[in-house]
Amino acid sequence: APAKLLASGCGDLIANVIAVKDWQLGHKKKKEYYGRYAADLALMSAEIVMENSSEFAKKGLDSRVIVEGLISAGVASCIAGSSRPCSGAEHLVSHALDKLAPGIGLHGEKCGLGSIMMAKLQGQDWKKIVKTLKNVGAPTTAKQIGLKPDVIIKALMIAQDLRPERYTILKEIKMTEKRAL
């Protein structure tokens, strides 16, 4: 598979770190079902990429490892009965970007960007996500995939409205233009 598509797959996998944290938040705040096995499987899928990203940077992306991670993430969603283990606020940002700038950037690239921003909001190690994405050759800025800053700001402001029933970190804050900056 082309390196760009594999890197995009890595962005989609890294998103699981954000999604699981959002799922835990939904469980805590809304008593939403939370399945530890599905969550752990989704996290393992992300961690395989994160732990091997330095190796990928040296030797190139290992398509088998990435595809296995994506399959495991899909299994985690099947076990959970929803996309919750693999789709949180970072995917809402990706979907908002799809709506505002259709056809620009690959799904996993936008999930990777969303993961950086949402990790910062969640208090997670966003710099580790940036490093991992760089190591696998995925974009870490909007400019790298052809998105303008105003589109990112608008996406952050509308993201939670796309799935109001899904509790994410975006429900915890009032996303304004000033905050999005």
Where are these regions (language model features)?
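C-terminal catalytic subdomain
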Residues: S87-Q124
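Amphipathic alpha-helical segments within well-ordered protein domains
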Residues: M50, S54, S94, D98, ...
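Short coil/turn segments at secondary-structure boundaries
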Residues: K28-K29, L61-E68, S87, Q144-K148, ...
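Carboxylate- and glycine-rich phosphate/diphosphate-binding segment that chelates Mg2+/Mn2+
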Residues: A1-R84
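Alpha-helix initiation and N-capping motif
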Residues: A7, A46, S63, E90, ...
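C-terminal charged capping/lid subdomain of soluble metabolic enzymes
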Residues: L13, G123-L181
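Short helix-capping/linker segments at secondary-structure and domain boundaries
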Residues: I18-G26, G81-R84, G103, L121-K127, ...
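Short, hydrophobic/amphipathic alpha-helical patches that form generic packing surfaces
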Residues: N16, I71-C78, G112-L121, I158-D161
